[in-house]
């Protein structure tokens, strides 16, 4: 607490009694300041699909660092990086790419592009869907649904800003249709895999309906693929579900484990960033500075990572391991007669919850969302205790998430499943699981 207000530099890293401070990481493992070794399922908050300190990425970064870390000029690596994005991401194939320094910045850019292009201010988002920490997208409350929805607008954000965002229940087609018919919406943004990295899944049919409705009303459809981009498939969730948005935001895997983000999409939208000698254009166009946009280090790492993905060297393994891991966790739950569930919307991010059924994950309106949220709140009390038990056994999960990489293997899966079982027995003995057995 001497240097940071909460002892950490990211809310999700806050942990009681003390957070984990690491000194090194390699492959699927990391080590803390006390030399404790962990099987890591944070994987850089989802950025490290190749695992820690991947040799090919590290080599490229070291070589580039020797050449220079920042030219203050354009460079060939950024062109190669953009070419790979356009090759892999469906909505970018006949469009343009704009690099940023993070996924949050990419979201800021995408919203501004949509608002300028449409000449409108309001944006639809979905409750519990995460889009970074900017003022607009942290709005997760809509008084129109209160009750049964509880909450308020976020602290520190002016109410007039909050009112430009229309937060709707996840997967609620009827609410979307009614809202867009009013004619004052610039864009709809969502995590296509589902809320909070897919914790609350989105269905293919909902995405198809969303595409139909936005196309009918002329509203810009934005997929936040900061998590799902290059993870669900080489082309992300839009390739996986076969639904192409107008714009996509990217981050995490994009930079190969280094800072980076991007907006990619239709040319007519991305041209809002163009510089033209047209009368009045300067007053309309979007200016985009950014000291570290497409910096050579991130571009070097991103090029290697996307290159391996493009060559098909990532997804066959990481998806297979993810499916095996989910099955292993469910087997442990069943063997211990515990009312719990392991699930995924992308095979390489597996969630664990208690008191959930597959039916509980089918949220389609405010009532089913509130029901889901109540079960989630109860489940998270157990998950927090589970996380501590597993950390003590050398497994670091991310608040009920297991994020996998190509570095995870059968040894990691078997060891984690075994330690998961031991942790459940520990929780059962102390009474933490009494409501779920």
Predicted ranges, named:
Residues 1-437:
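Conserved N-terminal phosphate-binding loop of PLP-dependent enzymes in the Aspartate aminotransferase
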């Amino acid at each position: 607490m001497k240097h940071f207000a909460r002892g950490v530099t990211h809310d999700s890293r806050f942990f009681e009694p003390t957070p984990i401070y690491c000194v090194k990481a390699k492959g699927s493992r990391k080590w803390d300041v006390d030399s404790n070794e962990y099987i890591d399922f944070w994987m850089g908050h989802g950025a490290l699909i190749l695992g820690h300190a991947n040799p090919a990425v590290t080599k490229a970064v070291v070589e580039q660092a020797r050449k220079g870390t920042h030219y203050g000029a354009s460079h060939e690596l950024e062109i190669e990086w953009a070419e790979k994005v356009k090759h892999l991401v469906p909505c970018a194939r006949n469009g343009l790419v704009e690099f940023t320094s993070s996924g949050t910045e990419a979201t800021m850019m995408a919203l501004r592009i949509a608002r300028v292009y449409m000449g409108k201010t309001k944006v639809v988002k979905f409750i519990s869907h995460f889009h970074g920490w900017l003022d607009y997208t942290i709005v997760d409350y809509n008084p129109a649904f209160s009750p049964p929805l509880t909450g308020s607008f976020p602290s520190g954000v002016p109410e007039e800003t909050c009112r430009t965002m229309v937060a709707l229940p996840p997967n609620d087609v009827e609410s979307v249709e009614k809202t867009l018919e009013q004619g004052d919406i610039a864009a709809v943004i969502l995590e296509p895999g589902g809320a909070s990295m897919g914790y609350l899944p989105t269905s293919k049919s909902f995405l198809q309906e969303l595409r139909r409705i936005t196309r009918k009303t002329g509203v810009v459809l934005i997929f936040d693929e900061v998590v799902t981009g290059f993870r669900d498939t080489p082309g992300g969730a839009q390739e996986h579900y076969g639904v192409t948005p107008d714009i996509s935001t990217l981050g995490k895997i994009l930079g190969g484990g280094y800072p980076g983000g991007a907006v990619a999409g239709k040319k007519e939208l991305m041209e809002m960033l163009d510089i033209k000698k047209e009368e009045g254009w300067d007053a309309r166009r979007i200016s985009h500075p950014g000291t570290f946009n497409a910096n050579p280090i991130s571009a070097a790492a991103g090029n290697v990572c996307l290159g391996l993905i493009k060559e098909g060297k990532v997804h066959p393994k990481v998806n297979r391991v993810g499916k095996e891991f989910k099955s292993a966790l469910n087997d442990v739950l069943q063997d211990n007669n515990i009312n719990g569930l392991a699930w995924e919307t992308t095979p390489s991010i597996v969630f664990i919850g208690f008191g959930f059924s597959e039916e509980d994950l089918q949220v389609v309106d405010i009532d089913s969302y509130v029901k889901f949220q109540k079960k989630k709140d109860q489940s998270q009390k157990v998950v927090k205790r589970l996380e501590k038990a597993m950390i003590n056994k050398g497994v670091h999960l991310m608040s009920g998430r297991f994020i996998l990489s190509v570095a995870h293997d059968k040894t990691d899966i078997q060891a984690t499943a075994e330690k998961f079982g031991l942790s459940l027995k520990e929780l059962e003995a102390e009474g933490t699981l009494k409501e779920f057995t």
